[in-house]
Amino acid sequence: LDVQRRITRHIEHLKSREAIRVNRAAMLKRIGSYSQKKSGTSQFVAKQYQGIVKALNTDSTGNWYRPVVSTFHTKTGRDHTLGSSLNQVPKQYWKSVLSPPKGSVYALLDYQQQEPMIAAYFAQCQVLMHWYQKGDIYKNIVQLVGGQFSRDQCKQMLIGRLYGIGYRTLAEKLGIALSRVRALSHELSRLIYPIDHYLARSADVIRHQGFARSLDWKYTISDLDGQLSLTNWKIQATGADIMRRACLRLDDANIPLLLTNHDSFLVRLEQAQFQNQLDAATQALTDAAADVLNGFRLKVAVEMMLPSQEK
């Protein structure tokens, strides 16, 4: 498809998405509970649920939530959900409020380590690409640094490098000494030098041209765009290119896609055809990434699976 047709199909896809069935009583219960807590996260989730409850469409089959998604809201081309949304709620909260229709399973599919591997592919960082094809890049980084850091700490550090997060901020976020953050960053620098070099060069090219371009998207920059946003632009825009192709491939496979959440996809599968449809959905996402990355395949995992409780 050419770009205009693909964007048009994506807009049509968004308009035709199924609504998401939720448990209104469970949401109301959690609004009451979370709003009484001091935790900022709990307060935030309560506010999101309040907005969702107000927008629910209720009929004889249940309570339905339809996200309002903007296609042209971000400079990188990623879809953006307007207003209160499930996207903004941490995914570990979802199971308690989703209510799949009878005979259905809600499944959340997730690209594994998408952003660092997009960067590794473009930079041809052979070490990360090899580790990824063999297993988990973060576990390999743990081994590289002699087990001094946890997998999550190594993940946060690598992602932080891609986003240009400073040492002090990372130290506070990870709860470790600044000197240890610097030491880990030094080890990462030796490992991902091709990525650092590629992203810096990409940002310089964007600045010189005055615009950034991916397969589907073009963004004209201004003096307000900082170097860090330009450095990360190609990764985010490529993720958006993959997302759009995944949406269309799921449509072609007759798999209802209900919601995208960055690099995750909430789909509805039929219990009677569960494994076949799960395989088809996984293949659709794998193929979408390969379409964008010239055959390089991102791995897909099932992050959440929620069958209907109705008999």
Predicted regions and their residues:
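Short, solvent-exposed polar/charged micro-motifs at secondary-structure junctions
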Residues: 78, 116-117, 268-270, 308-311
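Conserved catalytic core of nucleic-acid polymerases
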Residues: 143-260, 297-311
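Short beta->alpha junction loops/turns
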Residues: 111-112, 163, 177, 270-271
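Helical (often loop-to-helix) elements that flank the catalytic cores of nucleotide-handling enzymes
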Residues: 180-185, 272-293
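Acidic, glycine-rich two-metal-ion catalytic cores of nucleic acid-processing enzymes
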Residues: 1-145, 208-264, 278-285
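Catalytic palm subdomain of template-directed nucleic-acid polymerases
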Residues: 168-170, 174, 266-282
